[in-house]
Amino acid sequence: MRYTTDEGGRLNNFAIEPKVYQAQPWTPQQKVRAALLVGGGLLLVAGLVAIAVGVS
């Protein structure tokens, strides 16, 4: 376990830092999947708003 000791003798624990990496550009398949998820979400929200307007 990694820790440091300060002047008063107290121990400070530090979390293990994850490895940092740069994100890769999206593949065409990932772009299509993201577009479908966004479209489905918009349809869901539009449908719920339409139901709310219809009920009120």
UniProtKB/Swiss-Prot annotation:
Instruction: Report the source organism.
Output: Thermosynechococcus vestitus (strain NIES-2133 / IAM M-273 / BP-1)
Q: Write out the transmembrane intervals.
A: 34-54
The protein's name in its UniProt record: Photosystem II assembly protein Psb34
The similarity comment for this entry is: Belongs to the Psb34 family.
What the protein does comes down to: Involved in photosystem II (PSII) assembly and/or repair, probably in conversion of late PSII assembly intermediates into mature dimeric PSII.
Q: How does it sit in the membrane?
A: Single-pass membrane protein
Cellular location of this protein? Answer: Cellular thylakoid membrane
Question: Extracellular side of the membrane: what ranges?
Answer: 55-56
Q: Which residues form a coiled coil?
A: none
This protein's assembly is summarised as:
Part of photosystem II (PSII) assembly intermediate complex PSII-I; crystallized from a strain without psbJ, it forms monomeric PSII before addition of the oxygen evolving complex. PSII-I includes 3 assembly factors not found in mature PSII (Psb27, Psb28 and Psb34). The N-terminus of Psb34 (this protein) binds to CP47 (psbB) in close proximity to PsbH on the cytoplasmic face of PSII.
Q: Which UniProt keywords apply?
A: Membrane, Photosynthesis, Photosystem II, Thylakoid, Transmembrane, Transmembrane helix
Q: Name one GO biological process term.
A: photosynthesis
